[in-house]
Structure formats: C-alpha cells, structure tokens
Amino acid sequence: ELEMQDIADYVSVLDESDIKYSTFNRYITHMHTFLQFLKMKNIEVLKFYPERFLKKGFSEHNERSVPEKTIAHLIKELPAFPEHLQLMYLILFCTGIRKSEVCTIKSGAFYSQGNENWMRIYQSKMRREKVIPVPSLLVGLVNDYEKKYGIKNGEYLFKNKKGGAFNGQTFSNQMIRECKVRGIACGDYIFRAHDYRHNLATSMYGNGVSIQGVRDYLGHSSENMTKQYIDFMPERIVSAEDKYFSKNQSFKLKGAEDDER
C-alpha cells in the first residue's frame, strides 16, 4: 500500500538528483497521472496534490547559433554543392526564414523597388503573408536561377519530382549528405536549418535592432519567444550596461549631490 511517506521519500530522491527543474516537474506530473489512472480503475489511492511539490523556475536558453567557423567552411565549399542547394542555403543564411518557408518560395517572391530589395513570403505558422528586406545580390541570384530553369511567375522556385514544393526533410538530408562528404560539421551535429534563425536574430539584436523589431521580422507572437532566439543574451545585457555607465561616469544617485554639499 502506497503511503504519503513513500511519495515524500521519492520526491526527496528527485530533489537530490542532478536534474533540471523541468524534468523534476515532469516526474511529479507523471506520478500524479499514474495515481489518477489507478483511481479510474477503482483502485483506492491516497490524495496527492502535485502543486505542493512542483518547482518554479525559468526556461533554459539553448545557444544554437551556428559558429562562424562552420559557416565560413560551408560557404567555401558551397560552389561544389548542387545548384538548388546553393541557392536554398544562401536564402536561409541571408533571411533566417523557416525551412518550410524556403521550400515553398514561389517565383516572383524576390523583387526590387528603387534601391530597396524585398522578399515576399507566406508564414504558415502565423497564417499571413509578409515582406522582408533582402540583399540585392540575393535578388540577382534568384532572378538568374529563375531564368536559367524557365521557372514561371507563381511556380515553386524549388520543386519536387512532381512539380510540387520541395520537401523540407529532403532539403536537410541533402545538405547533411553534402556536408559529410566535405567534412563540414557543427560540434555534435552536421546541419540544422533552424539554427540559422538564431544567427539572424542574434546578429540583428547585436546591431541595435530592438526585441520588437526582431520579433516582427521573425514572425513571433511574443517577445519571450524571440528572446529564445537571441543567443548570448546575458553577455549582451552586461555589455550594454558597461557601455551605458562608461558614457555616464558622472552619473549619481538622486540625492547624492545634496549629501556632498
């Protein structure tokens, strides 16, 4: 027969284990679910209140930006990749859009207006179309690709064998295969398209774009989500504070001047 002391002992073991707070909470939730299951089977169980044991904490930030060394190696080897992968990677690198969005780009999505260059994309997660700025060189490369392969306006830029949109997993698999052949790797993995969103978000924020601006560009619904894409955030906050106080060395707390008089 299960007693409250048994649960207390189990929680104590978990508490002393070297596990994340989220893992701890998951174990507590699983235990509650199991007891509820027994209750549904008409097996008498003690009353268990998981909220008394759950820990409070903050979600961990995973640094996922692709190292510059890896990017430099990949770009150096890129001319040897199949042409469609070359262009898909450059779009990913320059825009940080989702892999699914790269695969569903249509001819005519890249265009110029005066000295400005734009890309029109449909963000499936947000269910809306938006326009983002892109380098002029990228627009030229896309236009050349469309002309070379006779891709008509409105057709998918990257097609599967049946003429539909290119498959996202196929893109990843082909990139991994090409990277393996050339010894390109990123630590314990070879290629993850989504990590380039971290690179772009981190770069934008590091160059003075506000959190709100980065959020709007990436198409997130909240700033908290956007912060998960900005790597080295604590270091950047400390750096910003150092810069502020170095420029305001005469800064004094209110009342300090009066005390000196």
What is the role of each PLM region?
Residues 162, 244-261:
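C-terminal secondary-structure termini that scaffold catalytic or DNA-interacting sites
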Residues 151, 173-216:
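Short, basic (Lys/Arg/His-rich) helix/loop patches that form interaction surfaces
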Residues 123-127, 218-243:
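Catalytic-site neighborhood detector that most strongly recognizes the C-terminal catalytic loop/helix
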Residues 95, 104-143, 261:
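Conserved tyrosine-mediated DNA breakage-rejoining catalytic core shared by Y-recombinases
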Residues 44-76, 122-123, 159-164:
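Flexible interdomain linker/hinge and immediately adjacent N-terminus
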Residues 1-62:
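N-terminal core-binding DNA-recognition domain of tyrosine recombinases/integrases
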Residues 110-114, 189, 209-228, 256-260:
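Short, polar N-cap/turn motifs at the start of nucleic acid-interacting alpha helices
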Residues 57-60, 69-99, 125, 197:
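Basic, Lys/Arg- and aromatic-enriched nucleic-acid-binding interface segment
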